[in-house]
Structure formats: C-alpha cells, structure tokens
Amino acid sequence: MKKIAFIGECMIELNGKPFAEMWQSYGGDTLNSATYLSRVSSSKEIQVHYVSALGTDNLSKQMLKYWQADGIQTNWVLQDEQHQPGLYLIQLDAQGERTFLYWRNQSAARYMVQHPDFAKVIAELQQVDVIYLSGISLAILPKNDRTFLIEQLSSLAKKGTEIVFDSNYRPKLWDSLEEAQDCYLQLLPSVNIALVTFDDEQALWKDKTSRDTLERLHKIGIPKVIVKCGKNGAIFSDRYLSQYGQVIPEPILNVVDTTSAGDSFNAGFLNGYLRNKSLEICCQQGNRIAGIVIQHKGAIIDKVAISHLQSEFN
C-alpha cells in the first residue's frame, strides 16, 4: 500500500450570487485533491492522509465527518480551540469562470505549525511515501512557519519521501512577487514532481512557453514536471526516463465551474503515479476526472458523478 499526505487548508465555501441564493460547502486546493484521489482509488492500494488544523466548532466537526466518509485519514488534522476554519465566496460568470473573496487570516490552518502537536505530525510523516502541498499551503502560513515547514520537508526528502508540489500561485496571498519566488525557490530543490499550471508559472517567472517552464524546473533539479495548460491538456517530462509528451483532453462543451479543474487533475494523476503508471497515462487520468468535475458546480462535486472512475482507473 502507498501512503500519501496532503498538507494545506480547507475552508467553508459559499457559492452563488451576492445577497441572493447561495449554497454552503467546503473546499481548498489540497483538500480537493485529497478528496478526489481518495474517491477514485482503492483503499487497499492507496491511503490518503490530510494534514491541517480545524477549530472545535460544529462546522469543523462536520467537515471532519465528511472527509472521513470519503476515506481520508484525519488523525493528522489538529484541533485548535482558539481558531475556526477560513471562509471563501465564489462568484461565477456566464462562462463558468470564477472570482473569489476570502476570509482566512485567522483560520486554524494558518497556525497549524505553531500547534503543540505539529512536531508529532512531522515525526509521523516519515511513514508516508509521498507528501503533497501547494503554494497556497505555504502562502497562508506566517513567514517563520513557512521556513520551518520547508526545512522539515527538505529533511524528509533527504530520507526518501517524495515531495509533490503544485505552485498554485495566488498573488493576493503574498506580500510581493519576490516573496513568493524566494519561498518557492527554497522548496523546489526538494521536489520530485512539479504539478504546475502554465498561467501560474507565467505570472511567477515570466515563462513564454510551457516548454520554458519544463526546462526551468528541470534545471532546478526536479525530475518529473507536468505543466497543465487548460483546454490544451498537459505536457509532461521526465528527465531521467526521457519521457516527453502532451495529453490533450476531449473538448468539454458544458463548462459550469472550473474551480477544481487543476486540483482534480492532480488527483487523477496521482492515482496513476502511486500505482506506477506512465506519466502519459497519469495525465490522461487527470484530464478524465477534470473533464467531469468542471461540468458541475463547486469545488467538491457529488461523488456519484465520478464513482465509475474507480473501476476505470484501477
């Protein structure tokens, strides 16, 4: 059995029109990926853990129950009596593109590294095969906590744990572009797989093409690089096995909500990767699940919509 731990934040989601009909759910980039990975995987082959912090309020307790119902291991989700989950509001336009408003500065996840039990979590992470985090996982933390987490991940990487990173660059979460760049450059040398989006990389590093992104990340020392390019699918490269290619998805005519397009792609990819599939097949799986997810509203869609993928993938 392979074990993977996702580090990050899950927030309460409000989705709809301001001062009109809205519906409540939850989501967050790493939790979205963890959920979709757990749903499309066999629990006998892949064990999914989540590392975060929640409050002791009823909403936090209910979210934990939902995660557990999806098969996610929550023993590394810390309980914080002083803070609650963050909140975000999604507003959609006619094309399914979204804008976000956030209330997260005092969220429990922001302070997880300072939790008295976080050191125990770091020690227990030595038992997992893969650790997944994103730029948002880092951005929400106070600066000293970011540095500490990166140091711990670097130490785990040296002991053989694989680190998977999605840059997921959100400018509003950083004091400056340079701050984000400096933080990423501290982590990237320890990363085994970069699962990035070209738009983010272009904003961060001024890459002109997806090939520029591949080459830049390989030069840093990352063995496997996948660049997500929206409707153009994904390109992949493995500098050791000389794998290189592009996987283009089937066109989706009914795009409803792209909130979790990249997150769900990562889940499909990781399901394949953890079962030793080729990078091409991993990307095909990523496209497959993302193509379904974007036809539904919300970060985490009804599990029935992708229930057939477990047998298809496995």
From Swiss-Prot:
The UniProt record lists the keyword Kinase: yes
Involved pathway(s): Carbohydrate acid metabolism; 2-dehydro-3-deoxy-D-gluconate degradation; D-glyceraldehyde 3-phosphate and pyruvate from 2-dehydro-3-deoxy-D-gluconate: step 1/2
Active-site annotation: 263 (proton acceptor)
Record keywords, A-Z: ATP-binding, Carbohydrate metabolism, Kinase, Nucleotide-binding, Transferase
CDD domains reported in the protein's UniProt record: KdgK
Reactions catalysed: 2-dehydro-3-deoxy-D-gluconate + ATP = 2-dehydro-3-deoxy-6-phospho-D-gluconate + ADP + H(+)
GO cellular component, one term: cytosol
Enzyme Commission identifier(s): 2.7.1.45
Origin superkingdom: Bacteria
Gene Ontology process terms (BP): D-galacturonate catabolic process; D-glucuronate catabolic process; DNA damage response
Residues at which ATP binds: 168-170, 228-233, 260-263
Keyword Hydrolase found: no
Segments traversing the membrane: none
InterPro entries from the UniProt entry: Carboh/pur_kinase_PfkB_CS, PfkB_Carbo_kinase, PfkB_dom, Ribokinase-like
Binding-site list for substrate: 28-32, 88, 102-104, 170, 263
MF terms (GO), sorted A to Z: 2-dehydro-3-deoxygluconokinase activity; ATP binding
Family: Belongs to the carbohydrate kinase PfkB family.
Function according to Swiss-Prot or TrEMBL: Catalyzes the phosphorylation of 2-keto-3-deoxygluconate (KDG) to produce 2-keto-3-deoxy-6-phosphogluconate (KDPG).
Protein name: 2-dehydro-3-deoxygluconokinase
